Amino acid sequence: MPTEYYIPASAIKALELLRAHGVQMRKTTVATKGLEQFAITANTQRPATNSIDTGSHGLRSLDGTWAATDVTAPIGSFAVAMNQKLARLAFYLLEPKSDDGLTAWNYLDDVLATEGVKSYPILRKK
């Protein structure tokens, strides 16, 4: 499990959902290096269906891998420490391959629905 996740300040819907669930975050005051980034190899948006599981919602799924990156989390990002009471919930919501997380429920579609996007917008520290 990572020690922290870094969420861009522009991911307003995702940040609001994390706050609503009680996940603790802090706004960063320095740029953070030594992170991992998820490289997307497949990005699939399922068509909306009217099912008991998803309502009339089309779930998104990603495939890819985490790898060390030179990308820096800028000042003003939101850090989610994974030594908190709700770490498991945070992990489930923030991991790109989670079947019921922010990606699946389209909370990051401002970035992920863009043609040709190659990287998950949330970074993590091992």
Please report, for each region that a protein language model flagged, where it lies by residue:
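Intrinsic-disorder/low-complexity accessory segments
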Residues: 1-126
